[in-house]
UniProtKB/Swiss-Prot annotation:
Note on domains (UniProt): Has a particular type of basic domain (presence of a helix-interrupting proline) that binds to the N-box (CACNAG), rather than the canonical E-box (CANNTG). The C-terminal WRPW motif is a transcriptional repression domain necessary for the interaction with Groucho/TLE family members, transcriptional corepressors recruited to specific target DNA by Hairy-related proteins.
Self-association and partners: Transcription repression requires formation of a complex with a corepressor protein of the Groucho/TLE family.
Pfam family, one: HLH
Domain of life according to the entry: Eukaryota
WRPW motif (motif): residue ranges: 164-167
Domain Orange span(s) in chain numbering: 88-119
Biased composition (Low complexity): 139-160
Molecular-function annotations in GO: chromatin binding; DNA-binding transcription repressor activity, RNA polymerase II-specific; protein dimerization activity; sequence-specific double-stranded DNA binding
Protein name: Transcription factor HES-5
């Protein structure tokens, strides 16, 4: 039987779904296979350690990924929880490094120089608090990354006016 071309407009919704179903299923399988291949690449060292010189099946890859994630989670729990201050400091440092990297990638403008100078300045002494901080309050950020910002900028100018902040 020769293939026939039928106008899609003439098909009923039920027939359209029947034609579309294999295409959708193939796309779903392709996504699954792609994700399994990415897992295999991410966990390549783990696979080499447990099963050297073996052809891994998809089920093996998924089992190894689950095992690795469980092991990683248990290891992180055994290391102990981070304090809020440490967690905040790490996040602040990472954000500051990203901002400095972004600012140094582009041609220097007056605004960029002001921002970089602002990142380099030591923090102003905090006013004494009338009440003790709440348990969930964010601690003061670590300023070790401010030194990294200073090293990233070879020249720093004193800004003529204060830096505008939206807060």
């Amino acid at each position: 039987m020769a293939p026939s071309t039928v106008a899609v407009e003439m098909l009923s919704p039920k027939e359209k779904n029947r034609l579309r179903k294999p295409v959708v299923e193939k796309m779903r399988r392709d996504r699954i296979n792609s994700s399994i291949e990415q897992l295999k690449l991410l966990l390549e060292q783990e696979f080499a350690r447990h099963q050297p010189n073996s052809k891994l099946e998809k089920a093996d890859i998924l089992e190894m990924a689950v095992s690795y994630l469980k092991h990683s989670k248990a290891f992180a729990a055994a290391a102990g929880p981070k304090s809020l201050h440490q967690d905040y400091s790490e996040g602040y440092s990472w954000c500051l490094q990203e901002a400095v990297q972004f600012l140094t990638l582009h041609a220097a403008s007056d605004t960029q120089m002001k921002l970089l100078y602002h990142f380099q300045r030591p923090p102003a002494p905090a006013a004494p608090a009338k009440e003790p901080p709440a348990p969930g309050a964010a601690p003061q950020p670590a300023r070790s990354s401010a030194k990294a910002a200073a090293a990233a900028v070879s020249t720093s100018r004193q800004p003529a006016c204060g830096l505008w902040r939206p807060w």
